UniProtKB/Swiss-Prot annotation:
Protein's GO biological process: pentose-phosphate shunt
Main location: plastid
Protein's name according to its UniProt entry: Transketolase, chloroplastic
Lineage: Eukaryota, Viridiplantae, Streptophyta, Embryophyta, Tracheophyta
Keyword vocabulary terms for this entry: Calcium, Chloroplast, Magnesium, Metal-binding, Plastid, Thiamine pyrophosphate, Transferase
Length: 519
């Protein structure tokens, strides 16, 4: 684990906002083993970069705090590039950018240094002309003997280096068995036996709390048993409740700490967490902001899903329940949009047990990220919720019917599960057979057996009401054409949480009325 990290940049990368976010914090952290090789060819898809990009990149990176090296002839100045890398490796206290000026399509007699070669193939005729121009007589995919010889020597060199490292680690393991075991678990990704026992459990007698606060309890409990758990917030730690109380801040002079201060860099934060997750199976990064601000980092979250990276996205202030901050801060379409994204778990817990269950699921899923949507407002600890239920995605928390034939099924998520439960009580007093279902994760429920899904949502029962303080988009799949989805299909408003729930019709009374219409 004493390696360097190399990053390849193009002109387009330098224009993207996320690169500035990442490069800014890399310099702040003094990441001396990060070396970026910038292919400076001044060509973009639409033409010369002069049409949109004229800044002095060298000075910008120097201002950020990077060491900057310029290789003026990148087409065949191999010795200069090699020397630049050695110089970069010698700089220990800051990252290095090596700007390598090149000609795009170098060697092509008709298309070099033109934007036509940026995103298109040369074509058979131009490939042949390029081969002749470069003096390359070999057949396609042929590797000349001198290249084979140069390349093949790296195999025994690599084996020797690996053997040396393993011997060094074996010696370290004898001297420091506990530290070695911890390091090995981070390298292999093997979870400690019984780690899930650290998750707190709750009863209805426990005081109610916002799920963001319950999330912090779970994070701190897990940090004691999962040494690879680390993360932080985009300048909202005191609101997202993501601080690990047993750790200090990860900074240039304290790299052993686990609280990461990402600053207001949502996109960069997500991208950094992807890198952490993909570096070692035993590293479990989490990052946090308000749920609505996932709009600033959605590209990184999509990459998490695409790359099968176990990143835990802790997203608080998950609905109109956040109150007076109003529609700019109130997520509406976000739950639906993440449910539409492949290979990502969207989890919306209702109380302490479900929050613990969400964290158990997030840690266990090695090949996909998880998004936890958490409330700002206080919620009760509900009867019938469980960690095991969350693992199924959807499950029954209460039911007074028999024979898997309730008169109506009320389906709630997160803060609205309480509304579903209270509406169920009202209807039962009126003699109705009511099943209340917590639907924490659509994705997990979809993965259950047909028999299990039928036991929760029997196909014979078409009287179904869903309650969620977000877009109703997609709920037709759950409630069916004869059911009713109660939600919000417009932007929110600035008002106290209780008042705004009434104004938007997300109330016990509205659920009861909808259920009666369907029965």
């Amino acid at each position: 684990v004493d390696h360097y990290t190399y990053c390849i940049l193009g002109d387009g990368c330098q224009m993207e906002g996320v690169s500035n976010e990442a490069c800014s914090i890399a310099a702040h952290w003094g990441l001396g083993k990060l070396i970026a090789l910038y292919d400076d060819n001044h060509i973009s898809i639409d033409g010369d970069t002069d049409i949109a990009f004229t800044e002095d990149v060298d000075k910008r990176f120097e201002a950020l705090g990077w060491h900057v090296i310029w290789v003026k002839n990148g087409n065949n100045g191999y010795d200069k590039i090699r020397a630049a890398i050695k110089e970069a490796q010698a700089v220990k206290d800051k990252p290095t950018m090596i700007k390598i000026t090149t000609t795009i399509g170098f060697g092509s007699p008709n298309k070099s240094n033109s934007y036509s070669v940026h995103g298109s193939a040369l074509g058979a005729k131009e490939v042949e002309a390029t081969r002749q121009n470069l003096g390359w007589p070999y057949e396609p995919f042929h590797v000349p003997d001198d290249v084979k010889k140069h390349w093949s020597r790296h195999t025994p060199q690599g084996a020797s280096l690996e053997s040396e490292w393993n011997a060094k680690f074996a010696e370290y393991e004898k001297k420091y068995p506990e530290e070695a075991a911890e390091l090995k678990s981070i390298i292999t990704g093997e979870l400690p036996l019984g780690w899930e026992k650290a998750l707190p459990t709750y009863t209805p007698e426990n005081p109610g709390d916002a799920t963001r606060n319950l999330s912090q309890q779970n994070l701190n409990a897990l940090a004691k048993v999962l040494p690879g758990l680390l993360g932080g917030s985009a300048d909202l730690a005191s609101s997202n409740m993501t601080l690990l109380k047993s750790s200090g801040d990860f900074q240039k002079n304290t790299p052993e700490e686990r609280n990461v201060r990402f600053g207001v860099r949502e996109h960069g934060m997500g991208a950094i967490c992807n890198g952490i997750a993909l570096h070692s199976p035993g590293l479990i990064p989490y990052c946090a902001t308000f749920f609505v601000f996932t709009d600033y980092m959605r590209a990184a979250m999509r990459i998490s899903a695409l790359c099968e990276a176990r990143v835990i996205y802790v997203m608080t202030h998950d609905s109109i329940g956040l109150g007076e901050d109003g529609p700019t801060h109130q997520p509406i379409e976000h739950l639906a949009s993440f449910r539409a994204m492949p290979n990502i778990l969207m989890l919306r817990p209702a109380d302490g047990n479900e929050t613990a269950g969400a964290y158990k699921v997030a840690v266990q899923n090695l090949k996909r990220p998880s998004v936890l949507a958490l409330s700002r407002q206080k919620l009760p600890q509900l009867p019938g919720t469980s960690i095991e239920g969350v693992e199924k995605g959807g499950y029954v928390i209460s039911d007074n019917s028999s024979g898997n034939k309730p008169d109506v099924i009320l389906i709630g998520t997160g803060s609205e599960l309480e509304i579903a439960a209270k509406a169920g009580e009202v209807l039962r007093k009126e003699g109705k057979g009511v099943r209340v279902v917590s639907f924490v994760s659509w994705e997990l429920f979809d993965e259950q057996s047909k028999e299990y899904k039928e036991s929760v949502l029997p196909s014979s029962v078409t009287a179904r009401v869903s309650i969620e303080a977000g877009s109703t988009f997609g709920w037709g799949k759950i409630v069916g054409s004869k059911g009713k989805a109660i939600g919000i299909d417009r932007f929110g408003a600035s008002a106290p949480a209780g008042k705004i729930y009434e104004e938007f019709g997300i109330t016990v009374e509205a659920v009861v009325a909808a259920a009666k219409e369907l029965i």
